[in-house]
Amino acid sequence: MVAGCSNTKTKQSSSDSSLQSQSSIDAKYINLTMVTPKTINPITNTDKSVGYIMNLVYDSLFTIDENYNVIPQLVKEYNIAQDGMSIDIKLKDAKWHDGKNVTSNDVNYTIGLIQKSADSPYNEFTKNIASVNIKSDKDFTIKFKARYAFSIDSLIFPIVSQNHLDSKDVNDKNNNMIGNGKYKIESYTEREGMVLSVNKDYYEEVPKTMKNIKVGMVPNEDARTSMVMALDSDITNVTLNDLSKFQEKEFNITKYQGRDYECVLFNYNNPFFKDVNFRKAIAHSIDKDRIISEGYMDDATPVNFPLNSKSKYYNSEMKDLEFNKDKAIECLAKVEYANVNSVNQNDNKVKNQKKSAKKNSKKLTPEEEAKAKKAEEDRIKKEAEEKKNREKEEVKKSLSEMNLKIIVNRDNSERIKTANIINENLKAIGINSTINQLSDKDMENALNSKNYDLALVGWKLSIIPDASSIIASSGYTDDKLNGYMSALTSSTSEIETKKAYKDVQTYIKDNATFISLAVRNNYIVSNSRLKGKITPNDFDVYEGISNLDIKSNESN
């Protein structure tokens, strides 16, 4: 599903023929692993490794392509109502692996099962669904509780069989053996694992070279990695920490854009951050290129907004606030501290009232009144200039004495490196800062109590391209942004949504409400005995596995 392939680099083995003899791998199959499942029901399962396998067995109404955009899967035709409150859908001529048709009743049953399963990873996606109106075996209408721009993007849950699950134990493995995807479950035991065979009756054409798959059971995620290292499994997703173990000729490394988003938050309880010029000064001072190369060791894709950079809603034409020391200093010179000299302003007001009262007690000639008026205007102008100069000096003094508190999780080495770079960048424009490395609990407490000035944090981007929760969590709000966000979430067409998102992204950039840094890259490691290209993504690491073949000398 959520496909987001980035650059792919391949390291080929010069001795492929030796690999088979070095391992217990079954050369006729593509060999995968999953943690021993509690259930193989794709709706109630909560283990990622199991979910990746079941994505091969079950299809969804819609799925996500390699650019993180929604596309139809089981859906043949669809039409969104003009008011955005419903969607009419016609299904493709898909069949279950037992030969029966996938029907509207299966969709209705699946939605009901998800809504009853509070722990389902798909539960959130169905909360806006009010009802399903079945018109025929292939035609139905989904009605929504509220208008929502990303209603289609939410329909990416796998469809399960009503016939095999209704009024039965939904978690019993024997009731979950029949799917509708490109692969069907040939056999499954905890001891022998699972064998997936090519579904030759799939509703769309599949590659002629498509291979069967054998899935081994392992106790935990670490074992999945170890199996590939030992050449006993062909493919797995790995963390950056494990990646260095695979820099050998036996493996292919595929890099793709994940969903871990990194950014810098401002504390708006600090009056300086309420000044857009101060925020822009911070933004212009930060060297993002250096952060990507040194902080994240080129293991991230730079972004200027919390969306995957390949999304159709991401404004790639929008230029970020560039790293420019001179512009940063120019912005600092424009900073105004609204609360400076508030006591003096009140004192001056009282004095002016007394002076005016005293002057008004004496009757003046027209010439004297004109002269007095001119003198008063000059005095007010002079006082205004003096006040402005005092405030400038006060701001300069405050900036020179400022020591911004930067908080960062002590267990995240990349963010610590980034914090040190930001510390150096700020010092270059005359702003001092101190880095506080905190535990998970202390980090959470500091964020909740607003005990920071800058915070280096991360979010897991939603599968649905809705950045509203991240924007809300940034702490910045005003009527104009609220208006843009309302227009975004209530838009009813792709054109409207793109326009609204463009307005939101431009406004956030122009006002430097927070600083987007990057989306982290993820990695898939595969045995070099395989050939072909896959397009993994954070939601479905085996996306495109049907395109893989086994080198001829490996399958003999």
Where are these predicted regions, by residue range?
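Long beta-strand-rich cores associated with HINT superfamily self-processing modules
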Residues: 528-556
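Ligand-site clamp/hinge motif
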Residues: 201-244, 432
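Gly/Pro-rich hinge or "lid" segments in bacterial periplasmic/extracellular proteins
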Residues: 48, 156-212, 222, 326-330
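Surface-exposed binding/hinge segments that line
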Residues: 79, 124-165, 187
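Aromatic- and charge-enriched surface segment that lines or borders ligand/interaction sites
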Residues: 76-118, 272
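N-terminal lobe/hinge region of extracytoplasmic solute-binding protein
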Residues: 32-80, 112, 178
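Append "and occasionally in soluble cytosolic enzymes with long acidic Gly/Pro-rich linkers
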Residues: 274-421, 554
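Extracytoplasmic/peripheral linker and loop segments enriched in polar/acidic and small residues
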Residues: 434-443, 467-529, 555-556
